[in-house]
Amino acid sequence: MENKNTQRLINLTIICKVNENEEMLKLVSEHEGHLTNVIYGKGSCKKGALAQAFGLDDDYKKAVITTLVYEENATKIIDKLNSLYNFNKKNTGIAFGVLVEGLLF
């Protein structure tokens, strides 16, 4: 296993339904997430042509989870979100990571 000091740090963001946030937090914790924040919100998009085009549903209550994880763990988390929670399909959730180095400059 690679030394943690040489691994790249990722700012991982997960957007999910509020009723799934505890499961997501457990997953983040199992993969050494640090400085984890949860923000609850309600979307402003009304169901219409634009919403249908992007596959948005009527459930506007969301949780936005941000955490810092090593790149290897970020990949594992996203893989689990795709396999266990079908994040690779519409109306299930969104997850993405940004390299922290890119945020510094």
Residue ranges and their predicted role:
Residues 1-105:
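Positively charged, small/polar-rich N-terminal and surface patches that mediate targeting and assembly
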